[in-house]
Structure formats: C-alpha cells, structure tokens
C-alpha cells in the first residue's frame, strides 16, 4: 500500500525586521496606490457597461426574429446569412467577455497579493509587540494594516461589480450560441431533405406486390 502523503503545512509569514519597517511601509503605500488604480474599471470596461443594455435588447429582438424565420423553413442561403450574422455577434460578445475575464483575473491576483501582505504585516505586528518595539513603530504597523484593509475593500468592490457585469455579458454570449445552435439544426435538416432520394425505396411492400402481379 502506498503511504498517504500529507500536504505540507504553509510556513508562517516572516515578520519584517524592526529596522526595515519604515522603509517597507513606504514601499507598501506606493504599491497600494498602484494596485487600487489598476483595479479601477478602465475605459474599455466602462464602454461595455454602457453599451450592454442596448446590445441585450437588440439580441433579444434578433433572436426572436431568427426563431420566427427558422420556423418558416428558410432557404440554405438565408440560413447561411443568419449564421454569419450571429457569428459576428458572438465574436463581439465573446470579445467583451474576454476583456472582463482578464480584468477579473487581475483583481484576483491583487487580492491574493494583499492577503499575503496582510499576513506578513500581521506577523510583524505580533513580533514587534513581543519585542516591545517603540509605540511609533507599532502605530506605523497598525496604519499599514489599516491601509491594506482599505485597499482590499476597494478592490473587492470593483471585483463584485465586474463579476456582475461579466455574468450579464455571458448571458448575451449564450443568446448567440443558442441562435447558432438552432440555425445549425435547421441547416442539417434542410441538407438532409435535399440529399433524400425522390424515388421510394425498393423494399416498399406495394412495389413488390405490383412486380409480382405484372
């Protein structure tokens, strides 16, 4: 029998030496500014949020019109035209979704980084208190931990809004996929009808009866 291997226990975050706390706190302050700035929704994401309601309404109307057209058994040329239209719409909505996903990943990474920093500074606070560091040092550590918490809140808020927008865009991608699936099914049916032989199969009982009585 193979021996079970327990996962390694994560090492505790190393505390920052007291002599380095002031410098590291300044560096962290600059990092927090950078992280929160990069987490804010950019112009592209703002445009997506602004255009999405109109896009959603248009896709609803176009999907209803496409369904009606498909019910009328359109020609293969019409089906191909519909397919190309929906492929363009799908490409556009997937492009939006890709941008939102990239930003969501960036926010996840920022939150992970902040979580690690919070642990490091938490360990630093405990170590500084244990070694009876001067009050100004403890106050600086506390201010740094507060700044990390504030940054986490801002980025988490951006992430929540982004994920909500991402879900709404995903619904529009689904509409396009639904339309393309329906079009493909009707295309297959139309092609099968074209390829079906006009003559009745030779195994029809009536044909054999007619041949035997001829």
Regions found by a protein language model. Name each.
Residues 1-214:
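Flexible, low-complexity extramembrane segments of multi-pass membrane transporters/channels
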């Amino acid at each position: 029998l193979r021996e079970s291997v327990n996962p390694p226990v994560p090492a505790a975050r190393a505390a920052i030496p007291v002599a380095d706390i002031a410098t590291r706190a300044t560096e962290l302050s600059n990092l927090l500014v950078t992280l929160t700035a990069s987490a804010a929704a950019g112009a592209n994401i703002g445009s997506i949020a602004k255009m999405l309601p109109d896009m959603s309404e248009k896709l609803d109307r176009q999907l209803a019109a496409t369904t009606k057209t498909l019910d009328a058994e359109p020609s293969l040329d019409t089906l191909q035209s519909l397919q190309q239209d929906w492929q363009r719409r799908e490409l556009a909505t997937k492009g939006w979704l890709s941008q939102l996903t990239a930003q969501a990943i960036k926010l996840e990474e920022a939150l992970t980084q902040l979580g690690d920093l919070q642990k490091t500074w938490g360990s630093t606070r405990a170590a500084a208190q244990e070694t009876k560091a001067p009050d100004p040092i403890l106050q600086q550590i506390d201010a740094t931990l507060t700044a990390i918490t504030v940054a986490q809140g801002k980025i988490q808020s951006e992430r929540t809004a982004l994920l909500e927008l991402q879900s709404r865009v995903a619904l529009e991608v689904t509409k396009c996929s639904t339309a393309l699936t329906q079009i493909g099914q009707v295309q297959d049916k139309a092609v099968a009808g074209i390829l079906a032989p006009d003559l009745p199969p030779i195994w029809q009982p009536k044909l054999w009866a007619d041949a035997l009585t001829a």
